[in-house]
Amino acid sequence: QMCIRDRFNAVLNILAAPFWSEDPDVYKAMISVVQKLNGHWDAFVNADLPIYDSKAKAAIDTLKKAEEWADSNGYNNGFSKVYWPQVQYAGKVYHLSTQATVTMQRVDNSHDNIPMESPSNKEIMCTAQYFGANSENEGFDQQDGNELNSKGITTAVFWGGLWVLWGPHTAYYEYGSDGVARYIFDVNIRMLMYITNGFQRRHGTQIDSTMDLSLQQSILIDEQEELDSLKGRGALIGDPTVEFLETANPTSNLMNGDFVWDISATPTPPFKSGTARVSYTDE
């Protein structure tokens, strides 16, 4: 376990390991680490699919190969985004997770570090897609990028005169499947992590204080104000709530000093697509 909080007084937000995350065992370890890191914190994984499988000694340089490799190797966890292929810029080749992590941080920073907006369709440092020195693949367009997105793979495409990161989904997503809503978009799960991590940061210093009615209500009020603030910023929609439920707090738990607050929140979804339908009229 990494002691990020202890060493840097910071909560891990994004975990990336360019190159290493192409190994399925490393990917699984990353997913395990970011769930309740040090017993408390949740974070998000940015991982790469390989453009060459060293174990199989085979190039992964087409859309079909990338989709099949991701599926057969279990790169489909909702706590992650997976990226393919690599990209070129200024004579260098970059793993796309590198560009994605920087872009995520930049977008988060534009919202005071609230992960309310997807890094998708944001400009990245790229002049071409890269599939390997010996690959015959000369690249693909946004339509092919959408095909990758439908399988939970985020990519890079030339769109609107810019090279951009393309795909707002987590690796869990597959078009047409009945899935868990919180894992559909990257902003969904990252916002929920932001809320739970924030709860612990705000109230961690109160642990082992006397839990009387005043403290219970104070936490309720503080958390509702936080949710209302996030809604006011556009990070949440609907009516987010926090409750202290009797059913979630049986006497046996209270006697042991264990208390639960239930938070319900709906992150604001991204504007994934828009269609204008035009019909002719002679009126």
Language-model segments: residues:
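C-terminal edge-of-domain segments
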Residues: 248-283
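Composition- and surface-driven signal marking solvent-exposed, interaction-prone regions
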Residues: 29-31, 219, 241-242, 275-279
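Short, conserved loop-to-beta-strand elements that form functional interface hotspots
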Residues: 47-51, 55, 239-248
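Short, flexible loop/turn elements at secondary-structure junctions
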Residues: 16-21, 246, 265-267
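A glycine- and small-residue-enriched flexible loop/hinge signal that marks low-structured segments
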Residues: 7-202
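Short, small-residue-biased leader/transition segments that mark boundaries at the very start
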Residues: 2-4
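Acidic, low-complexity glycine/serine/threonine-rich segments
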Residues: 182-246
